[in-house]
Amino acid sequence: MIYSSHSLIRYSAQAFHCLATVCLLSIASHGSAQTLFGFDANSSAQQRQMETDFDALIDRDEMDAWLRDFSSEAHHVGSPKSKENAEAIAELLRSWNYDVEIAEYEVLFPEPLARELELVAPNRFTASLVEDPVESDASTSNTDNLLPPYNAFSIGGEVEAELVFVNYGTPADYELLERYGVSVAGKIAISKYGGSWRGIKPKLAGEMGAVGTLIYSDPADDGYGPGDVYPNGPYKNDSGVQRGSVMDMPTYPGDVLTPGVGATGDVNRLRREDAPTITQIPVLPISYRDALPLLEAMGGEV
């Protein structure tokens, strides 16, 4: 897991305020055969019967139709389809006699302006950074309003440096690299998804002095290794990329500009440059198809 290739990340992000919609619903969970906490013997039996009746109303085909509709278009936070989905879910819940409120928040949500990844030595390679459509799944060809593969709340930036493979990018991995005399300081760390939450990877890499992070799904973990890839199974094909936030949630979750309070229209907000949960180095997720030429170009011990 040593290094010797070079890689270039050009990655910038634009942030804007958007409207996020949320539906909340609390449903009681099944208890044991004993008296439920907060219920006497009679009311426990009534509660269990209500839950049994509720379960009997669940229709698998109906749920499949809802899921297909909700996921038929890109529906990231603040998108038209996200709002449409929230309103549709709210109406369904109201039809079942639930009291539903859609709460509106103005949160910071970054989108990438440009994404580039190039290997410049010992040979040249330009990553595609795209996911191939799946012929049997029409939704994968619908690119209207579709955001490209990226990690939200990565800082923007452009770096060129040597590439170091850091396995899963966990503390144990960095301890092993240190024993081999390998440092990521001033370099780009490339790690596999897994082993820890993805937001920990750029956080640790930055603390170790790295100037950028690449993250890919290794096929041994999420690909042909454990089973069939999509659409024949649940695992990623060679162009699949895991998206998701890399904000420093252990510091605080939620909107990066309004720690500890709801992101309503009149609340005080941090400046973006002062938000501690935005990464300190650029992060870019890639497929294992794009990762392979980078890994093949590397030298050193394995």
Q: Which positions does each model-derived feature cover?
A:
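N-terminal secretory signal peptides that target proteins for export/translocation
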Residues: 1-13
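Bacterial N-terminal signal peptides
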Residues: 15-27
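Sec/Tat signal peptide C-region and signal peptidase I cleavage site
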Residues: 29-33
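Noncatalytic luminal/extracellular "stalk/propeptide" segments of secretory-pathway proteins
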Residues: 36-49, 56, 68-185, 219, ...
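Second-shell loop/turn segments in exported
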Residues: 50-57, 71-80, 150, 190-195, ...
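Sec/Tat-exported extracytoplasmic proteins
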Residues: 58, 62, 67, 71-81, ...
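Soluble metallo-hydrolase cores and metallopeptidase-like ectodomains found primarily
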Residues: 136, 141-176, 252-302
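A conserved hydrophobic secondary-structure block that centers on an alpha-helix together
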Residues: 167-231
